[in-house]
């Protein structure tokens, strides 16, 4: 347990202590869920330790995915931010990255699914280990992932990019590059935002 806490602390210290990177620095390819040619891009800036993000992920996202992502209407990207406890959120995103593009969202969804129990018990270790294992990151790979400088640098660039876009709260949603809402969205609000994004896209 002590080793695990030390790794999480090192993760947070590493993210906070490196010099800021330029906002235009590359953040790597997007981890897109859905068809790459879907007409509307939905970006959600979220934290794995944000209760509002967890509620959206567990209560609204499944219906959103079925109605918009699985039908080819939307391509979705979750972009990371860190909320307290920031070291746990950072560790979760690092583990999701280590799972690779195909299983990135498997880890993200696994953490959100266990978030309420994690808050209730205070046992972040078990939550992260279980979610990471679902994405194929276990054993020695778990600790190696959390201490990987390249992964920390990549996450830092994503966080810097979010700051550059003025994101201050989670969740925050963009539709085709337009900020729609800071806060949880209902399925009805998503319907309206999707229709507005399509209409704006069709304007000459």
Q: Which residues fall in each region the model found?
A:
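C-terminal segment of classical bacterial N-terminal signal peptides
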Residues: 12-21
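Structural alpha/beta surface segment adjacent to cysteine/selenocysteine redox centers
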Residues: 48, 54-133, 200
């Amino acid at each position: 347990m002590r080793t695990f806490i030390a790794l999480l602390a090192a993760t947070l210290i590493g993210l906070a202590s490196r010099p800021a990177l330029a906002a235009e620095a590359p953040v790597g390819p997007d981890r897109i869920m859905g068809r790459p040619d879907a007409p509307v891009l939905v970006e959600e800036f979220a934290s794995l330790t944000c209760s509002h993000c967890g509620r959206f992920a567990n209560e609204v996202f499944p219906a959103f995915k079925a109605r918009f992502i699985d039908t080819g209407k939307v391509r979705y990207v979750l972009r990371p931010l860190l909320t307290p406890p920031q070291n746990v959120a950072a560790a979760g995103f690092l583990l999701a990255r280590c799972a690779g593009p195909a299983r990135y969202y498997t880890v993200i969804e696994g953490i959100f699914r266990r978030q309420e129990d994690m808050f209730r018990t205070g046992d972040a270790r078990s939550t992260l280990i279980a979610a990471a294992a679902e994405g194929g990151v276990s054993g020695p790979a778990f600790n190696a992932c959390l201490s990987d400088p390249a992964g920390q640098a990549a996450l830092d660039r994503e966080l810097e990019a979010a700051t550059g876009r003025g994101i201050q709260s989670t969740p925050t949603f963009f539709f085709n590059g337009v900020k729609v809402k800071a806060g949880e969205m209902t399925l009805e609000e998503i319907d309206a935002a999707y229709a507005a994004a399509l209409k704006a896209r069709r304007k000459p």
